[in-house]
Amino acid sequence: MKFLVDTSVFLWALSEEYKLNPAAQEILKSSTSELYFSAVGSWEIAFKFALGSLPLPKAPSEYISHALRVWALRALDITHEHALRAGELPVHHRDPFDRMLIAQALSEEMTLLTADRVFQKYKVDLIFCGK
């Protein structure tokens, strides 16, 4: 099964795994899970790091590259199809990072791993990963 890991789940898996529920931990550790991390997550992390609102032990480029290898995450680039799909989503909230993740999950037929309850307002397959 293909899973798209949202930014908060990605960060929790790296440094605060206790925040993830057991089902999420099992999916992330399973050798049969196809795990993807979007370029939008990298953008969000780099942006928040630059603003000073997300402390990291090293630069985002190093941190993310290391995490992709450790967790065997596949990179998911942003396409024009994703961008257009994000623009077509109902406006349940205005976070552009979240909207892009939802659009990508829909376009690529992936299940979104998230800890953000607002995602439930959209018609996207998801698994809630928080406790």
What residue spans do the PLM features occupy?
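Short, well-structured N-terminal submotif of metal-dependent ribonuclease cores
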Residues: 1-38, 51-66, 108, 117, ...
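Phosphate- and divalent-cation-binding pockets in alpha/beta enzyme and binding domains
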Residues: 44, 85-88, 121-122
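Alpha-helix capping/helix-boundary segments
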Residues: 9, 41-42, 82, 101, ...
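Active-site neighborhoods of divalent-metal-dependent phosphate/nucleic-acid chemistry enzymes
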Residues: 55-61, 65, 69-115, 129
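Generic structural signal for small/hydrophobic residues in well-ordered secondary structure
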Residues: 7-8, 45, 86, 105
